[in-house]
Design a protein with these regions (language model features):
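Short beta-strand segments enriched for Tyr within beta-sheet-rich domains
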Residues: 64, 141-148
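Residue-level signal for inorganic ion chemistry
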Residues: 21, 53, 79, 120, ...
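Pseudouridine synthases involved in rRNA/tRNA modification
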Residues: 101, 110-117, 124-127, 137, ...
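RNA pseudouridine synthases
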Residues: 1-91, 95-97, 202-211
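Residues that recognize and position ribonucleotide moieties
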Residues: 42, 89-90, 113, 142, ...
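Thr-Gly-centered strand-to-loop micro-motif
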Residues: 7-8, 55, 106-108, 132, ...
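Short beta-strand segments
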Residues: 90, 94, 116-118, 130, ...
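Residue-level recognition of beta-strand microenvironments
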Residues: 43-44, 84, 123-125, 158
Length: 213
C-alpha cells in the first residue's frame, strides 16, 4: 500500500513490509540480505503501490535475483505523468546515481551512475496528463521517477523530482505509480507465474476524473 516502507531504516523502524512479513512468516524467510531485509529480493518506493516478490528460502532468493539480473523477470508499472507525452512508445537510458547536490535524491549521472533502461508505452492522453505503462530492464533506485522527470514528464504527485506544482488539484502525497505486473519462473516448479495487482482506489479515481474531461 501507499506510504509503506519495504524495510526498517532511519525514521522507519516499525510498520514496514518486513515487519508484517516477519510477523506472518517468522523465521521462514531468506537470509541473504541479512536481518534487516529478510526475504526481500527487490524493492518499491514508499509511495509506490503494487506487488513485489518475497522469498522464503535462500535458493528461491538466488533464483529470483538471477531472473531480475538477466531480465527474464517481467516488471511492469502503471503511472500518470505530467504533460502530453507525444511518442506512443519510447526508451529512456540515462545512467542513474546519487544527486551530488542532494544525497537523498537520485539523478541522471552519466559519469558515476549505473546504467538504467526504462521502456514506456502511452495508454491514454488527457491534455496535460498522460497515463503510461513502464517496463524495466534495470532496477535502479527511483528509476522511473528520475527517468520521466529527466525528459520533462515527472510523475503526478512526485514533488521530489517534479516540484510542488506536480500534485495538481489532487494534493497527492507522493508519486502516482503502481507496480502492476510481475512475471517470473517459480524457483521450484519451473512454472511461469504472472501476478497482476489491481490499481489502488485513489489511482482509479484520478483516472475516472481525467476521463470525464
Amino acid at each position: 500500500p501507499k506510504d509503506m516502507v519495504v524495510h526498517p531504516s532511519a525514521g522507519h523502524y516499525s510498520g514496514t513490509l518486513v515487519n508484517a512479513v516477519m510477523y506472518h512468516c517468522g523465521d521462514e524467510l531468506s537470509g541473504i540480505n541479512g536481518v534487516v531485509r529478510p526475504g526481500i529480493v527487490h524493492r518499491i518506493d514508499k509511495d509506490t503501490t503494487g506487488s513485489l516478490i518475497i522469498c522464503k528460502t535462500d535458493a528461491a532468493h538466488i533464483h529470483i535475483a538471477e531472473q531480475i539480473k538477466n531480465h527474464s523477470c517481467n516488471r511492469r508499472y502503471r503511472g500518470i505523468v505530467v504533460g502530453n507525452v507525444t511518442e506512443d512508445h519510447g526508451t529512456v537510458t540515462g545512467a542513474i546515481g546519487r544527486d551530488p547536490k542532494d544525497r537523498k535524491k537520485m539523478a541522471i549521472n552519466e559519469k558515476n551512475g549505473k546504467p538504467a533502461v526504462t521502456h514506456y508505452t502511452v495508454l491514454e492522453r488527457f491534455g496535460n496528463y498522460t497515463y503510461m505503462e513502464f517496463a524495466l530492464e534495470t532496477g535502479r533506485t527511483h528509476q522511473i521517477r528520475v527517468h520521466m522527470a529527466s525528459i520533462g514528464h515527472p510523475l503526478l504527485g512526485d514533488e521530489v523530482y517534479g516540484g510542488r506544482h506536480v500534485s495538481g488539484k489532487w494534493h497527492l502525497q507522493g508519486q502516482t505509480l503502481h507496480a502492476m505486473h510481475l512475471g517470473f519462473i517459480h524457483p521450484t516448479t519451473g512454472e511461469f507465474l504472472e501476478i497482476n495487482a489491481e490499481l489502488p482506489e485513489y489511482f482509479e479515481k484520478i483516472l475516472a476524473e481525467l476521463r470525464r474531461k
